[in-house]
């Protein structure tokens, strides 16, 4: 067999092979992704420029082409246009002060122009912290919601999933949690992934009206933005969180929501002709979420002592938690809050289903007094749900069972909470102490909310309550003076209520 020797010198036009290593040509365009030739030195997640002006990122590499996702939605890209790699991996710009900013996936300000230059950058994709740099979760992150802080507490450095149907109150829990951090020295990052622009604006306005934008950053892509921008958004939020964590800060990141993130990634991979798997999602769907969420940790003191607490959200269909994406994220996180539409429609807000919700490591971070006052609340609510079904069928119950029903009904009413009205640790202690010591047994369930409002009002009027609140972090158990104060507050409220 004769060997064919290819001699380029016999041709008048020479091909610059070195040029092709860093440059390429648009060969095909398809719904926000482009197929490109050349770019032999291209690497996954490298930033590129198409025609020197359109931003993109390399998302697919194979023998035939380089797949690029367009960050900016545009119809101006044509076949044959020049593509050049920047030599950098996709990054988010960081500024001296990040609080109050509303940015896109690369750190560019949204809704307003800014001449300020970035002081640093942070890579969107990086490895998770080494296990020897991570510490245990021992400090609480209080949401201000009684049912969560008492039964399914969250610690700083934890990953706690919120899942439920549409319109079941997922975002409201996140917003309440952000607002509750106003005096907790926590930087909050709200990441909106593929939501309606009007909805994002509403959340931002709520945060601004409650002063929460003073310690918060919003990373947002709307449903009208490109698929690639939606896919990159949570990584941009996490990159910003890591930069703040490395400064020794505590960070709370809300990911709203990862269902839309998975849908955007599915669409991108199908456009690149990757083989679909379960529910048409690609085979690495688990990886894209695990590699994201495992970056949320509590660092040890030798590595700054900062933390990232992640609260991702997942939208379910008909309360089905066995679908592909929900089961994936449940297995990645340290616990989940399951919101039921049935509870929400009955006026139980937050609509947390205590029987399915769990916090695997948050209990270690819970305040000792709240942990003691909350130890049997899950059992009370579980027994109430079981016995309530018997009552619905008209079955007679013994006195012991009726006591369980009465306690469960009281506790259910006690856990109802108006939106944008978070409770402090000491306010929660007052409420739980009143319940656990039988002070609410004579209060009709219909009047519990009124009684709770009067109780908290009376607590703030008590001469010792302010000093009790100031010292609560250092108090591990209630002493005689604390008990005397609490019972005095409850008795005074009882006299007012009667």
UniProtKB/Swiss-Prot annotation:
It comes from the Bacteria. Pfam families: ATP-synt_ab, ATP-synt_ab_C. The record marks 357 as: Required for activity. It catalyses: ATP + H2O + 4 H(+)(in) = ADP + phosphate + 5 H(+)(out). The keyword Transport applies. Keywords: ATP synthesis, ATP-binding, Cell membrane, CF(1), Hydrogen ion transport, Ion transport, Membrane, Nucleotide-binding, Translocase, Transport. The keyword Aminoacyl-tRNA synthetase does not apply. CDD domains: ATP-synt_F1_alpha_C, F1-ATPase_alpha_CD. It is found in: Cell membrane. It is an enzyme of class 7 (translocase). Gene3D superfamilies: 2.40.30.20, ATP synthase alpha/beta chain, C-terminal domain (1.20.150.20), P-loop containing nucleotide triphosphate hydrolases (3.40.50.300). GO terms for cellular component: plasma membrane; proton-transporting ATP synthase complex. InterPro entries: ATP_synth_asu-like_sf (IPR023366), ATP_synth_asu_C (IPR000793), ATP_synth_asu_C_sf (IPR038376), ATP_synth_F1_a_nt-bd_dom (IPR033732), ATP_synth_F1_asu (IPR005294), ATPase_a/bsu_AS (IPR020003), ATPase_F1/V1/A1_a/bsu_N_sf (IPR036121), ATPase_F1/V1/A1_a/bsu_nucl-bd (IPR000194). One of its GO terms (biological process) is proton motive force-driven ATP synthesis. It is a peripheral membrane protein. Its EC number is 7.1.2.2. One of its GO terms (molecular function) is proton-transporting ATP synthase activity, rotational mechanism. HAMAP family: ATP_synth_alpha_bact (MF_01346). Produces ATP from ADP in the presence of a proton gradient across the membrane. The alpha chain is a regulatory subunit. NCBIfam families: atpA, PRK13343.1. Belongs to the ATPase alpha/beta chains family. F-type ATPases have 2 components, CF(1) - the catalytic core - and CF(0) - the membrane proton channel. CF(1) has five subunits: alpha(3), beta(3), gamma(1), delta(1), epsilon(1). CF(0) has three main subunits: a(1), b(2) and c(9-12). The alpha and beta chains form an alternating ring which encloses part of the gamma chain. CF(1) is attached to CF(0) by a central stalk formed by the gamma and epsilon chains, while a peripheral stalk is formed by the delta and b chains. This is ATP synthase subunit alpha 1. It comes from Listeria monocytogenes serovar 1/2a (strain ATCC BAA-679 / EGD-e). The gene is atpA1.
């Amino acid at each position: 067999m004769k060997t064919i020797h290819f001699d380029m010198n016999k041709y008048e036009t020479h091909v610059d092979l070195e040029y092709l290593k860093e440059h390429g040509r648009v060969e095909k365009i398809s719904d926000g992704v482009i197929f490109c030739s050349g770019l032999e030195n291209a690497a996954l997640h490298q930033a590129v420029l198409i025609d020197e002006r359109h931003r993109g990122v390399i998302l697919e590499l194979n023998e035939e082409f380089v797949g690029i996702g367009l960050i900016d939605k545009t119809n101006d890209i044509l076949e044959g246009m020049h593509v050049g790699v920047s030599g950098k991996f996709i990054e988010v710009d960081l500024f001296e002060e990040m609080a109050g900013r509303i940015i896109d996936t690369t750190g560019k300000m949204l809704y307003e122009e800014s001449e300020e230059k970035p002081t640093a950058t942070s890579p969107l994709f990086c490895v998770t912290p080494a296990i020897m740099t991570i510490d245990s979760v021992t400090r609480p992150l209080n949401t201000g919601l009684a049912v969560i802080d008492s039964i399914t507490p969250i610690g700083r450095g934890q990953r706690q999933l919120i899942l439920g149907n549409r319109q079941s109150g997922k975002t409201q829990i996140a917003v309440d949690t952000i607002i509750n951090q106003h005096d907790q020295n926590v930087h909050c990052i709200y990441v909106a992934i593929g939501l309606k622009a009007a909805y994002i604006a509403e959340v931002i306005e709520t945060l601004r009206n409650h002063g929460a934008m003073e310690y918060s950053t919003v990373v947002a892509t709307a449903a009208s933005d490109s698929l690639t921008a939606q896919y990159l958004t949570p990584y941009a939020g996490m990159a910003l969180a890591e930069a703040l964590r490395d400064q020794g800060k505590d960070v709370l990141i809300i990911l709203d929501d990862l269902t839309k993130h998975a849908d955007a990634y599915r669409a991108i991979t199908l456009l690149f002709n990757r083989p679909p798997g379960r529910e048409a999602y690609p085979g690495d769907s688990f990886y894209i979420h695990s590699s994201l969420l495992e970056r949320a940790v509590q660092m040890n003191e030798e590595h700054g002592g900062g933390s990232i607490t992640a609260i991702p959200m997942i939208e379910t269909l008909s309360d089905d938690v066995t679908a592909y994406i929900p089961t994936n994220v449940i297995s990645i996180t340290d616990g989940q809050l399951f919101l039921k539409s049935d509870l929400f429609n009955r006026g139980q807000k937050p609509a947390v289903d205590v029987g399915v919700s769990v916090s695997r490591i948050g209990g270690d971070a819970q305040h000792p007094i709240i942990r003691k006052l909350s130890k049997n609340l899950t059992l009370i609510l579980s027994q109430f749900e079981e016995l309530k079904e018997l009552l619905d069928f008209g079955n007679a119950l013994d006195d012991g069972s009726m006591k369980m029903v009465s306690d469960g009904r009281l506790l259910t009413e006690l856990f109802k909470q108006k939106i944008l009205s978070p409770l402090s640790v000491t306010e929660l202690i007052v409420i739980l102490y009143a319940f656990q010591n039988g002070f609410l047994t004579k209060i009709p369930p219909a009047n519990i909310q009124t009684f709770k409002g009067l109780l908290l009002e009376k607590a703030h009027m008590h001469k010792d309550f302010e000093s009790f609140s100031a010292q609560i972090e250092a108090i591990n158990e209630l002493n005689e003076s604390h008990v005397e104060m609490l019972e005095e507050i409850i008795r005074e409220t009882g006299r007012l209520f009667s």
